[in-house]
């Protein structure tokens, strides 16, 4: 449950050496019943704490970061599949996923739906910094393109790719139906030959699926090479 309250905060004014009281609105996230807490979430919170306290300081592409390697989290998707201790843009997540599944590389399609998470990487300035002479909004052969047209030559966001490349997603769905015990149920967005053509190389690069026929369940293991854990 979320509530908003007005509280008085004392702010020090260095010019006159006095404290001033300022009324501020603060959002609180409140649990009414501890039994309702998403237990799977504790592993996420524990990992955040571990990175902050024991992570390795690294100077990366985006400046200084705290780094950790080989961490693992397991979530039961039969229960509530989202974090509850921070705001989660469910519609944004869903729209981006559907955009990936479509195989699109055109950021404008996301913008038209109110999704701007790729806009910073789709600007002409950013694309030029990557050495890419694309039209603004063209993200190159990123996730969805690799899922639906793996290996196809890239001709820009307006290109026609019908029957071009290998449709991994189509194959994966068919293979799960016809050969559920296969150990090759893999979906990959990592194509080394195309990394320099992408606005950004993929972060979640590989997913492997596992069918438990006895229980009638489908599990997914995802490998993510890099992630902004606190966003």
Where do the language-model regions lie?
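Terminal, non-catalytic protein-protein interaction segments that mediate quaternary/complex assembly
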Residues: 17-231
């Amino acid at each position: 449950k979320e509530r908003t309250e007005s509280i008085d905060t004392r702010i020090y004014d260095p010019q006159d050496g006095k404290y001033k009281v300022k009324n501020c609105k603060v959002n609180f996230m409140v649990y009414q019943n501890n039994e309702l807490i998403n237990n799977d979430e504790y592993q996420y919170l524990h990992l955040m704490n571990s990175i902050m306290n024991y992570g390795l300081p690294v100077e990366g592409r985006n400046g200084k970061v705290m780094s950790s390697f080989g961490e693992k989290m397991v979530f039961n998707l039969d229960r509530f599949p989202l974090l509850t201790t921070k705001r989660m843009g469910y519609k944004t997540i869903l729209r981006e996923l559907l955009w990936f599944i479509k195989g699109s590389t055109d950021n404008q399609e996301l913008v038209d739906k109110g999704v701007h998470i790729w806009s910073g990487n789709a600007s002409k300035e950013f694309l030029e910094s990557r050495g890419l002479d694309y039209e603004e909004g063209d993200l190159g052969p990123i996730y969805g393109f690799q899922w639906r047209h793996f290996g196809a030559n890239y001709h820009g966001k307006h290109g026609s790719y019908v029957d071009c490349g290998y449709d991994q997603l189509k194959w994966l769905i068919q293979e799960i139906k016809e050969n559920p015990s296969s150990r090759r149920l893999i979906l990959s967005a990592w194509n080394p030959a195309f990394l320099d053509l992408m606005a950004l190389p993929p972060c979640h690069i590989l997913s492997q699926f596992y069918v438990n026929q006895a229980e009638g369940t489908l599990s997914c293991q995802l490998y993510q090479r890099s992630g902004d854990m606190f966003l």
